[in-house]
C-alpha cells in the first residue's frame, strides 16, 4: 500500500514537472452599459489588473452601442443566465454584480484556482500594423501530450480607457473590438511535440485608440469551453518584439 501511494505521488509530481506553466487566466465578462449591476464587474476586472493578477480580460458587450458580431458571438457561446457574468478560463462562472462595489473579492479566488492549473500548450505571437491592417503571427506548440480535442485558437483585440458615461462610471476597459480572423476561431490540431504557426489578420477601426489596445490570444476546447492557455500583448509590445 505504501509503495502504491509513493508511486501515485511520484506520478503526480512528474505531471507537474513536465506540464507547461499557465501564462494567464482569461477572464471573459458578458456585460452591457444598460446593466445596473455591471459596474461591479467592470471594477472587479480593473482591480484584478491594478493588483497585478495574472489575467487577460475581455469584456463582451451585448445590447449596447459597444456590442458587435464578435462580442455577441462570445455572449451567445456562453449563454449566461444573466448579465454580468464572468468566466475564468471559460469555467467557474460568477453570475451577477453590484452597482457600486467591486466584484474583486469574488473574482480573485477563481483566478488563483485556475492559475494553479498547468497547461500542455504554449502560445507566442508577433505582429505588424500597416495603416489599419493588423497582422498577427501566432505560434502554438504542444510540448506535452493532451487529451483535448476540438481546440480553437482565438485572437481578440480589446480597447481600454474609452471615455463613456454609464451607470455612474466614466470609462470602459477591455472592450472586445475585433476577433481575428473572425469570431469562429482557428482550428488547432497538434501532435505531441509539434509546433504550428498561424497567420491572422483584420482591419482596425481608425476611431479606436490603438495605443490603448491589447491583443489576447487563447486556446479553447470548443466543446467543454475550458481555456487551455492564454497570453496577451499590449499593441506596442506585439509590434516591437518581432
Residue ranges and their predicted role:
Residues 1-23:
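Bacterial Sec-dependent N-terminal signal peptides
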Residues 3-4, 24, 113, 238:
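Hydrophobic transmembrane signal anchors and adjacent membrane-proximal interface regions, especially
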Residues 17, 29-31, 85, 134:
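Generic hydrophobic/packing signal
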Residues 20-56:
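Local sequence-structure signature of Cys/Sec-based thiol-disulfide redox active-site neighborhoods
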Residues 43, 53-242:
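Short, conserved sequence motifs used for protein processing/export or organelle targeting and
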Amino acid at each position: 500500500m505504501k509503495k502504491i501511494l509513493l508511486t501515485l505521488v511520484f506520478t503526480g509530481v512528474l505531471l507537474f514537472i513536465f506540464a507547461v506553466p499557465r501564462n494567464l487566466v482569461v477572464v471573459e465578462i458578458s456585460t452591457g452599459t444598460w446593466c445596473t449591476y455591471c459596474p461591479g464587474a467592470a471594477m472587479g476586472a480593473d482591480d484584478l489588473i491594478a493588483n497585478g493578477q495574472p489575467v487577460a480580460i475581455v469584456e463582451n458587450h451585448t445590447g449596447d452601442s459597444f456590442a458587435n458580431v464578435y462580442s455577441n458571438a462570445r455572449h451567445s457561446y456562453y449563454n449566461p443566465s444573466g448579465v454580468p457574468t464572468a468566466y475564468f478560463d471559460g469555467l467557474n462562472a460568477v453570475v451577477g454584480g453590484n452597482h457600486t462595489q467591486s466584484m474583486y473579492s469574488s473574482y480573485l479566488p477563481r483566478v488563483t484556482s485556475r492559475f494553479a492549473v498547468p497547461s500542455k500548450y504554449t502560445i507566442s505571437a508577433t505582429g505588424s500594423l500597416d495603416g489599419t491592417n493588423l497582422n498577427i503571427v501566432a505560434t502554438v506548440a504542444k510540448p506535452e501530450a493532451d487529451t483535448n480535442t476540438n481546440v480553437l485558437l482565438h485572437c481578440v483585440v480589446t480597447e481600454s480607457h474609452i471615455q463613456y458615461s454609464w451607470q455612474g462610471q466614466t470609462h470602459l476597459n477591455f472592450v472586445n473590438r475585433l476577433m481575428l480572423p473572425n469570431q469562429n476561431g482557428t482550428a488547432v490540431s497538434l501532435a505531441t511535440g509539434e509546433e504550428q504557426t498561424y497567420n491572422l489578420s483584420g482591419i482596425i477601426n481608425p476611431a479606436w485608440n490603438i495605443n490603448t489596445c491589447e491583443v489576447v490570444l487563447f486556446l479553447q476546447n470548443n466543446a467543454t469551453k475550458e481555456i487551455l492557455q492564454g497570453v496577451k500583448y499590449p499593441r506596442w509590445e506585439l509590434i516591437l518584439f518581432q
